[in-house]
Amino acid sequence: VNGGIYHAPTLLKDNQARDSHRVISFNTSKQMRKLLRGVVTDGSGKRANVLGYEVAGKTGTANKLVNGHYVDKKVMTSFLATFPASEPQYALFMVMDEPKPLKETWGFVTSGWNTVPTAGKIISEIAPQLNVKANYDLDELRRSRIIEATFEKPVRP
């Protein structure tokens, strides 16, 4: 999503010894960024949509193998996010091992109900600390629950 350039991951800021090279075309990267943003604006990653920070991401839910058989309610969920989607600077990868079904999730244990909202909360807290400039474009504001909610037509949380 960064234009198609691989950068060796590091925990060090301004690490000069990074291995960088092109792995996919710029246009393919741009298209993937658009698709991954759609996961958060219109798909199973909606609960990670942090107004102003253009989160993009991919959800994942995998049934666990127990005694040679996949078990429906034993899953690992994941969410790989990047932000801001227009110019990705940060990535966040979350995994939950066997999340429990809750009343609030109507018993669902897929990524969109547990890993995704947790990632959204983390991003909403760390983005300002990382000095990521919020971008409240008009289209995002129109789609947001803030503008949709009115006294005549309240929006459920």
Language-model-derived ranges and their functions:
Residues S86, G112-Q129:
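C-terminal, active-site-flanking charged/polar segments
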Residues V1-V50, P101-G112, Q129-K153:
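Conserved active-site-proximal loop/helix segments of enzymes involved in bacterial cell-wall
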Residues V71-K74, T82-P88, R145-I146, P154-V155:
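Extracellular/periplasmic catalytic domains that process cell-envelope and extracellular macromolecules
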Residues S29-L36, T77, V116, G120-I123:
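Extracytoplasmic/secreted envelope proteins and their assembly/folding machinery
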Residues V39, T61-N63, A85-S86, M96-P101:
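Solvent-exposed loop/turn segments at secondary-structure junctions
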Residues L80, P88-G107:
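Short, well-ordered beta-strand elements
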Residues L51-P84:
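Short, Gly/Ser/Thr-enriched beta-strand-loop segments that form substrate-interacting elements
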Residues M32, K58-G60, L80, L92, ...:
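Residue-level preference for non-acidic, small/hydrophobic
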